[in-house]
């Protein structure tokens, strides 16, 4: 009998090969560097709102424990650490964690980076759980969601960012981004693994969390930047609160 786990070994090996590119804004992860400011702003605003914090204060997140699941090279962990949060970043790809640790030291920050999976640290609890651009890469979505929710404290919030399962997302996120524009390596995403907002809401709601918001994120080619939108056909973020 095989023990359940959320790891897709092919996905891990794929990102292992790319990990050294994480902190190169003009490298293979350039699209993520371009996408990062809008998701970072969204997270900071809504974390502050949920915990009634003023982002203009010095170290406004100093009493918060935050975990970023599938943290990669630490693109979200570092800015949250700078805001005073106690940040844990976990990733199943060891190379990602090594890259994140190196950059953390170069940045003079203190972040708890672990090469592990959410189901392996269920004894730890956090105020904020981040599942950003990770759910479309896991093997067992239901088990992954359950494992992530197990890490959340009462009163805490969990965020998901992923890609909707629509014809538009196939055209833009795969054909456009991978084959035409070459923003991402071919094979980065599989349309069959994309998931709709309603699917996430239904899966999370089984655990009696309250759905707070779903927001789309679209790319504006005129300004060469991402912006928030009511259009959730391709990229979107959603978050939930545990009472």
Name each region found by the language model:
Residues 225-243:
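Core SAM-dependent methyltransferase catalytic element
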């Amino acid at each position: 009998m095989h023990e359940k786990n959320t790891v897709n070994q092919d996905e891990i090996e794929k990102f292992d090969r790319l990990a050294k590119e994480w902190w190169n804004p003009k490298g293979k992860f350039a699209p993520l560097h371009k996408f990062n400011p809008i998701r970072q702003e969204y997270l900071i605003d809504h974390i502050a709102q949920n915990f009634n914090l003023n982002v203009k204060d010095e170290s406004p997140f100093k009493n918060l424990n935050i975990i970023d699941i599938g943290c990669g090279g630490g693109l979200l962990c570092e800015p949250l650490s700078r805001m005073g949060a106690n940040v844990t970043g976990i990733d199943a790809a060891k190379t990602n964690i090594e890259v994140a640790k190196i950059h953390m030291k170069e940045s003079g920050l203190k972040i708890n980076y672990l090469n592990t999976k959410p189901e392996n640290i269920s004894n730890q609890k956090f105020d904020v759980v981040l599942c950003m651009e990770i759910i479309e890469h896991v093997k067992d979505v239901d088990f992954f969601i359950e494992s992530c929710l197990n890490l959340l404290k009462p009163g805490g919030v969990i965020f998901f960012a992923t890609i909707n399962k629509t014809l538009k997302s196939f055209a833009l996120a795969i054909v456009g981004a991978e084959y035409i524009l070459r923003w991402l390596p071919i094979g980065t995403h599989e349309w069959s693994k994309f998931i709709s907002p309603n699917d996430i809401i239904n899966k999370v709601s089984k655990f009696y969390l309250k759905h707070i918001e779903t927001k789309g994120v679209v790319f504006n080619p005129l300004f060469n930047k991402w912006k928030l939108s009511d259009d959730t056909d391709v990229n979107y973020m959603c978050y939930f609160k545990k009472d």
